Amino acid sequence: MANAILSALVRKGTSPTESSFLSLDHLSHTLRLPRGAISEILGRPSSGRTALLHAILAESLSRGEICAIIDCADSFDPASVRNNGVALERLLWVRCGRKPDRALKAADWILHGGGFGVVVLDLCDASQETLRRIPLPWWYRFRRAVENTTSILAIAGSHPIAGSCASCVIEMERRDARWSGSAHVPVLDGIDFRAASRKPVRASAPLRAVLGAVS
């Protein structure tokens, strides 16, 4: 089904323009999400949660898998993601117009259709009150949909919402910025993050992101 959807929807993208981008230089074993399960990636804005999601998508797409991102807040930036190594021709982007109910229905359709390596449900910009109103049966339905498959459902947000239905919970935290240049002309080289596996409990993993430009 995934191939059929992309064949129907794919359009030629525009040429990438020069821009700064955030690129994770590796994924540690601690951060590999389990297949056939729900994972949550949590953190505040600028905590590295989006960079981690992009790295997970890039790794999956590099293996030839088809992926999907369900964008509740219309915040996905294709240009920066292309610069981060994501092959857009194999990525389905679903825009939901800031309506979580549409995002949930889209996720349900995609998961039950099958054929996707990683499905990202981006709820980062949804308020905590909105997330609390999501009925719990949604998460049980999603868990049943991915069980015994090779798919990953990665839910991105600021607070945990899937409860016992999530097999993995990773919390991201921004640490230090790395600078070069002089005191008068500082240059930002990159940002360090820390990823803590809250479920299952494991040692925290340091991550390093670099800034650059691609034309």
Model-inferred region functions:
Residues 143-215:
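Phosphate-binding/switch region of NTP-binding enzymes
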